[in-house]
Swiss-Prot record:
It is found in: Cytoplasm. The gene is dnaA. The keyword Repeat does not apply. Domain I is involved in oligomerization and binding regulators, domain II is flexibile and of varying length in different bacteria, domain III forms the AAA+ region, while domain IV binds dsDNA. Plays an essential role in the initiation and regulation of chromosomal replication. ATP-DnaA binds to the origin of replication (oriC) to initiate formation of the DNA replication initiation complex once per cell cycle. Binds the DnaA box (a 9 base pair repeat at the origin) and separates the double-stranded (ds)DNA. Forms a right-handed helical filament on oriC DNA; dsDNA binds to the exterior of the filament while single-stranded (ss)DNA is stabiized in the filament's interior. Keywords: ATP-binding, Cytoplasm, DNA replication, DNA-binding, Lipid-binding, Nucleotide-binding. ATP binds at G176, G178, K179, T180. This is Chromosomal replication initiator protein DnaA.
Amino acid sequence: MSSSLWLQCLQRLQEELPSAEFSMWVRPLQAELNDNTLTLFAPNRFVLDWVRDKYLNSINSLLNEFCGGDIPTLRFEVGSKPISAPPRPQRTAADVAAATSAPAQMQARQSLHKPWESRGPEPVDDLNHRSNVNPKHKFTNFVEGKSNQLGLAAARQVSDNPGTAYNPLFLYGGTGLGKTHLLQAVGNAILERKPNAKVVYMHSERFVQDMVKALQNNAIEEFKCYYRSVDALLIDDIQFFANKERSQEEFFHTFNALLEGNQQIILTSDRYPKEINGVEDRLKSRFGWGLTVAIEPPELETRVAILMKKAEDHQIHLADEVAFFIAKRLRSNVRELEGALNRVVANANFTGRAITIDFVREALRDLLALQEKLVTIDNIQKTVAEYYKIKMADLLSKRRSRSVARPRQLAMALSKELTNHSLPEIGDAFGGRDHTTVLHACRKIAQLREESHDIKEDYSNLIRTLSS
């Protein structure tokens, strides 16, 4: 009874939730039904709290639908069911194909439950153990928002359960969005709990350089020994492996060895794994074996929170209206925000003036002028039309077909977010539409970004293109 009931719930939740969200929070749950009480077992307290906070109503609603009036009491526990493994939703044809294409060793690896601990032997010669983890990058000073919430949660889970939670963890997104911060925060969290752990952070180019040096020195076995003995390997900008065939070959075998040993791998890239050109398909396939999470450009509230946090680090007072002024005009990434604030703070220190909106406008005049020049309604319209492969004339027309109406709504929402034009001005630019039409479009897109993974992804891609 418990298996079939929870299986029904799983199948429905899998249909309703984005795949990454389902894989991270719902799939790990195990279920047991005793005396009309359905107990859901979560792997740790973090998952338990998240599921109870985010999905309790949905689960109760499904139980009501599937059980009629005889609804079991729902309770949560940290741990695992004492008997068989949790039920899984029925696999699709794509799932089966992916599973059968994976090598047998991957299936064997998934059945291993080795304790996570430091592995020897010690590295030799100039491949001395170096973590390279920046101690300043921690979870405590990472500003959370909707744009990075899933990535932060995944990183925390990996740091709590390295080698078992999500392996590999693949974070992707544009420059300056916090991927490196999260990567190193995991490393710091692991080292805080296990100071002797072999945690190695590096840019992908360093892996290539180490391999080349090992080949030159006839020390490739030492190179393999070093990289395959780490407890956690954190590699930034994996896209730089593109077209480096020997490096990809060596990393392929290192990757397999680490996964078989339940050693944690975390990778970052500026794009989705399958979109990385010049990297072998077998590697791209493995990048997706664990959990793949997008880190998106921060929304307005998160940008403001980042500015306030950085101002606090500088020990200066930043008025709310000043933070909003900067955040509304600089939207592309966190690094740009930090650079702008650093310039404002430096100017204030040099001149002794108070940080007001007028002062910020003066200190950042070239940067703000460039942003206003780059992001115009016309530019947004052209970018959206090109992205969806429709004609500009159709985008501005009265046509209501879905293939045109949705891109038009997206373009209106982007115009509202990325420019300082009023709703009537935006409506005017879209064929003389009323401001209420623009308002409806903005609300509709905001709703769809919550409900549709595709719309959310398209919106993020367009923001990235327009802000680059």
